[in-house]
Amino acid sequence: MSDNTTLAPPAASQAPATPRKGPPKFKQRQTRQFKSKPPKKGVKGFGDDIPGMEGLGTDITVICPWEAFSHLELHELAQFGII
């Protein structure tokens, strides 16, 4: 065998046939879009339909915000960012 037939490794400066891409980049949405509408304040079933409470109406001052959403579950309040 002759000394002129040595195998040389490929040049390091050669780029691969397909360039490697990094992981896909996701953009953060500025606003959150919900498929359903957020709940409205107020207790379901409270108002003029209660005997003896006709004159009070449905405009009730809510001391605790939890009272305004007492008809909802905790996961529903968390879904819309109320709690």
From Swiss-Prot:
Q: What is the lineage of its organism?
A: Eukaryota, Metazoa, Chordata, Craniata, Vertebrata
| Record remark on domains | The C-terminal region is important in conferring inhibition.
Q: Can you tell me which family this protein belongs to?
A: Belongs to the rod/cone cGMP-PDE gamma subunit family.
Q: Name one GO biological process term.
A: visual perception
The Enzyme Commission number assigned here is: 3.1.4.35
Physiological role = Participates in processes of transmission and amplification of the visual signal. cGMP-PDEs are the effector molecules in G-protein-mediated phototransduction in vertebrate rods and cones.
Q: Name one GO molecular function term.
A: cGMP binding
Catalyses:
3',5'-cyclic GMP + H2O = GMP + H(+)
Composition bias, Low complexity: 1-19
Location of the region described as Disordered in the Swiss-Prot/TrEMBL record = 1-51
Compositional bias annotation for Basic residues: 22-43
Q: Which UniProt keywords apply?
A: cGMP, Hydrolase, Sensory transduction, Vision
Subunit comment: Tetramer composed of two catalytic chains (alpha and beta), and two inhibitory chains (gamma).
The protein's gene is named PDE6H
Give the top-level enzyme category: hydrolase
Against PANTHER family, the record matches this protein to:
RETINAL CONE RHODOPSIN-SENSITIVE CGMP 3',5'-CYCLIC PHOSPHODIESTERASE GAMMA-SUBUNIT-RELATED, RETINAL CONE RHODOPSIN-SENSITIVE CGMP 3',5'-CYCLIC PHOSPHODIESTERASE SUBUNIT GAMMA
Q: What name has this protein been given in UniProt? A: Retinal cone rhodopsin-sensitive cGMP 3',5'-cyclic phosphodiesterase subunit gamma
An example Gene Ontology CC term for this record:
photoreceptor outer segment membrane
Q: Classify the source by domain of life.
A: Eukaryota
